[in-house]
UniProtKB/Swiss-Prot annotation:
It comes from Clostridium botulinum (strain Langeland / NCTC 10281 / Type F). InterPro entries: Aldolase_TIM, His_biosynth, HisA_bact_arch, Isoase_HisA-like, Isoase_HisA-like_bact, RibuloseP-bd_barrel. One of its GO terms (biological process) is L-histidine biosynthetic process. HAMAP family: HisA. Belongs to the HisA/HisF family. It comes from the Bacteria. Gene3D superfamilies: Aldolase class I. The keyword Transcription regulation does not apply. The gene is hisA. GO terms for molecular function: 1-(5-phosphoribosyl)-5-[(5-phosphoribosylamino)methylideneamino]imidazole-4-carboxamide isomerase activity. Its EC number is 5.3.1.16. This is 1-(5-phosphoribosyl)-5-[(5-phosphoribosylamino)methylideneamino] imidazole-4-carboxamide isomerase. GO terms for cellular component: cytoplasm.
Length: 242
């Protein structure tokens, strides 16, 4: 299982939200480039970045910082937030983004997903953010009537190979992920599933690993000191080699 440390960008700074609430945001680091370098030093093989300004406005706002991070750290980066059209996807892939995450656009524009997957295959991921098992969009401000598993199955039929699943009620809480929903999703589709939201300690990571989940995104637990990234990566890799 791969551990992806998270950087959420707002106005050029690293912040963390609580349950997806932009009003409950807290700056955790002034310099995201320094954070990314620290993640690399601690053994990260992949970094998860969200442009929160982009998620709200529908267009990437922190591209210069993101581009600099890619050039500086030289490890794969996946990016979500405000990616709504093929031109933006093209631009991001050209800029060196390894995997582009579509969220709102995937729900509102199935045609875009089809075109993107046809062109970029596994470089496209779908971010499914759920509230009470329903898919939320537009920076989590609006909740649809679509069940998260039904949506994941639909994406799989299109050819999507990577799904990032977040239970919004758990995100930023350090109260543990929604293991029940994660398990159901992982058993319902054959895509790579990446767990996100609420992961609080190494024990959570071990449980997710046992579910045969492809990856886990860790944010607040690293910034709060609950998880030592270097130690977590070593432990999970050791478990993988058993």
């Amino acid at each position: 299982m791969i551990i992806l440390p998270a950087i959420d960008l707002k106005e050029g700074k690293c912040i963390r939200l609580y349950q997806g609430d932009f009003k409950a945001s807290k700056v955790v680091a002034e310099d995201p480039i320094e954070v990314a370098l620290k993640f690399k030093e601690n053994g990260a093989e992949y970094i998860h970045i969200v442009d929160l300004d982009g998620a709200l406005t529908g267009e990437i706002k922190n591209l210069s910082i993101i581009s600099y991070i890619i050039k500086t750290i030289n490890i794969p980066v996946e990016l979500g937030g405000g990616i709504r059209n093929l031109n933006t996807i093209d631009m991001l892939i050209d800029a060196g983004i390894e995997r582009v995450i579509l969220g709102t656009a995937a729900l509102n524009n199935r045609g875009l997903v089809e075109k993107a997957v046809k062109k970029y295959d596994e470089k496209i991921a779908i971010g499914i953010d759920a509230k009470n098992e329903k898919v939320a969009i537009n920076g989590w401000l609006n909740v649809s009537s679509i069940n998260y598993i039904d949506f994941a199955k639909e994406m799989e039929k299109i050819g999507v190979r990577n799904i990032i699943f977040t239970d919004i009620s758990k995100d930023g809480t350090l109260k543990g992920p929604n293991l029940d929903q994660l398990k159901k999703l992982n058993e319902s589709i054959s895509c790579n599933v990446i767990a996100s939201g609420g992961i609080k300690d190494i024990e959570d990571l071990k449980v997710i690993k046992e579910m045969d989940v492809y990856g886990a995104i860790v944010g607040k637990a690293i910034y709060s000191g609950n998880i030592n990234l270097n130690e977590a990566i070593k432990i999970i890799n050791k478990e993988s080699s058993k």
